[in-house]
Amino acid sequence: MENNSEKKIVCLINPLAANKRWKRRRKLRAELVKTLPGSCLDTPRTKEETVEMTRSICPSADLVVAVGGDGTIADVLQGIFESGRQDRVVFGVIPFGSGNAFRKSLGIPRNPFKAIKYILEGDIFTIDLLQIEDRVAAFASVGSTAAVTGEKLRHSIPGLFGHLLAARKLLFYKRTENILELSGAVDQEGRQYDQLTINSSFLDCVIGNSNYFGYSWLVAPQARLDDGFLDIILFEMPPLIYIFLFPFIYFGWMQRKLRHFKAKEVVIRGQGLEVQYNGEYLGSMDRVHIKVIPAAIRITGNRKKADRFLVNRADRADSRSKV
């Protein structure tokens, strides 16, 4: 974008993010109002209202900024796509939630005051997203991590402590036989398939375009933000072994030894599959449909730090543009 003063920037702030710390962080609001030309709006309490607010402001916005965690990001992205303006609006992220996984793949610092710099001066580059049923997201999972997300939601336990407490559900998670139907698939040996069917009694199936998950967990080290594929990782082990290996899983070391696929689209069939996207619980279902949205949206970030998660590393023409 040529000139900040000539462009309409809208910040959508989740005041309930990060255990309502927003109420104690008036300084951040003052900095946003001072630094970013345009509007700073608090999002409503419900997801549906946040999506609707985003949809309503998109026709007059050039840059839409989500201030919150991964759930807020998912809601704002949903609103942008429902407005039909995803090819015209630039998306920005200022992390201020319990889970801020998405920002890490983009090279955006966790400190919200430092993140403001990348809204104004950051690189602009194009990334893929995924569509899970009728929702837009950067990552999703089917199985035990989704069950933990649902448990946390049911008991309204905030923050990291809530995740750790809800994680006890992992110990009792029962694996069942599931079928994955992949379209436009590539296996870990590089073999390509128009259609590929996989049987798996996975504990967890992670599907993503971005690399991080939850609390800076490098769950998908081989995913690329702009390769036009979903990254699919199968954790096919009992819960106790998963917990024992979790330090290696957290840093992405174990994933290269697991079954791993890329695909344009996947349908997962099973009984009572628990599903989450961007840390939001979608529910329990017997069939889940996920597909990649290639070149989905332009986003502001730190291209230098994000480079290892990008395919188009040599092409800087797009990223040289400043907001």
Q: Which stretches of residues belong to each language-model region?
A:
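ATP/nucleoside-binding phosphotransfer catalytic cores, i.e., glycine-rich phosphate-binding loops
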Residues: 193, 199, 224-230, 234-323
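Catalytic core of DAGKc-family lipid kinases
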Residues: 10-13, 20-21, 83-204
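Short glycine-/acidic-enriched loop or helix-start segments at secondary-structure transitions
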Residues: 22, 75-77, 103-105, 149, ...
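ATP/NTP phosphate-donor binding region
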Residues: 1-67, 74, 79, 306, ...
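Glycine-rich phosphate/pyrophosphate-binding beta-alpha loops
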Residues: 141, 145, 206-219, 281
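Short glycine-rich anion-binding loops that position phosphate/pyrophosphate groups of nucleotides
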Residues: 69-72, 96-99, 142-145, 210-211, ...
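Short acidic/glycine-rich loop or secondary-structure boundary segments that cap or lie
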Residues: 146-148, 189-191, 212-216, 240-243
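Short helix-capping segments at alpha-helix termini
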Residues: 34-35, 83-87, 277
